[in-house]
Structures are given as C-alpha cells and as structure tokens.
Amino acid sequence: NQETSPAYVRKMTNVAASNATNYQYSGTDIFEYRYAELLLNIAECYAAKGDITKTLAYLGKIRNRVGIPSANNYGIGTLADKYAAIEACLYERRVELAYEGKRYWDIQRWMLYSDETLSGVANTTCAKLGLAPINGTQRTGNYLQYKTTATATDPLAASRPSISVDPDAAAATFKAQLTALATYYNTNFVLTALPTPMDNVSGAAVKIKFNPNYYIMGLNTATL
C-alpha cells in the first residue's frame, strides 16, 4: 500500500521548498555516494574476509565523525565472528544511510527476506547473520496523540520552548536534556494504533511475502 506519513524528515531536505509543483521538482542535491558509505563498504569487505579488527576500525571511523565516544569500540562492542561483523555493518548502514534509498538494495543483495531454498540451492543468510527473516512481518505505524482533550489548537505552545537537546553540551547536561525530553513525551503523548493496518488488503492486515525468484530481476522481452 502507498501510504503518506506525517513524519517530517529533515535529512537532505530543503525546508524552504515550494509545493507550487506538488514537490515534483527540487533544487536540493541528492548525495548518491558519500564518504561515509565508502567507509561502510570498506568495513563490509573486511567483515566478509573475517578481519574483525579492520571492520571495527572502519565502523569506528564512521561513529567518530559524529562524536560518539570511543569506549567499547564506539559502542559496537565485541564481534564474535565474521557473521557478527557483517551484521554490524548492515546495522550501521541502516543508521548512517537512513532515508537515502539504500536499504532496499542491502536487503536484495544479502537475501534477507527469507532462508528459503531456490532450485536446490540452500540460502542460510539470515540464520548465519542472526537476523529474523523479513517475510512474515509487516510494517507498523502509530499515531502520536495528545493524552488529554486539547483546549487549544496547540496545547503545548507554552511548555514546548523549555525543551531543548544540545548534543554539543557537556555529557551530563546532554543526558539530563534527553531525560527531560523523554519525560515530556511520556507525560503528554500516547501511541495509538492505526485504524487500518499500513499493509492491508481491503482493510485486513497482510504480511510480507517475498518469493525467492523475485531476487532475479528479469529483462523485458523487448530489451532482448
């Protein structure tokens, strides 16, 4: 199902963009390939070789760029084997490259939908990486609703300005700000399930079912 979302993604977004053309055109550049992805690719290559030390080194370079403390391998911890290293790379890609259109291709190339056998060839990728197959799951969504009956169009207009989170502040201050933000959300908002599931057929929930043969992208006969 094609779903619109109330989420406002600021990443690579021009906040001054005009909707005069229904956002068909944009002057905002798209970064198709950037330095962080190069580091991710190198880390993944080392992971596939089983070189865990180099994998951690390159994942650390990525996290160091955004100011994550170096303790415990920049929060990654210890990787038991090459499969754990590969999974760590895939996780880092999900975080670093979020909203950049990369996840679809990562799922394709690592065959993460299921461990089904295709034409006698066993696929155990998910089992090896310790990941749950995507097949059988479904997208979830919730409304973030105000907990009490609103008495104004913006009932939090007065309290909201006091909430601020500054990643560059001292560690103790930053931690206190995050705690205050969490308290603010827990006090004022509640997650409410959607009346109609995001993935549905005639309003009834359906789960993802990606067949193994879908991994092979065919060519149109006209091309051949």
Question: What is each model feature region?
Answer:
Residues 1-224:
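Acidic/polar-rich alpha-helix caps and helix-coil junctions
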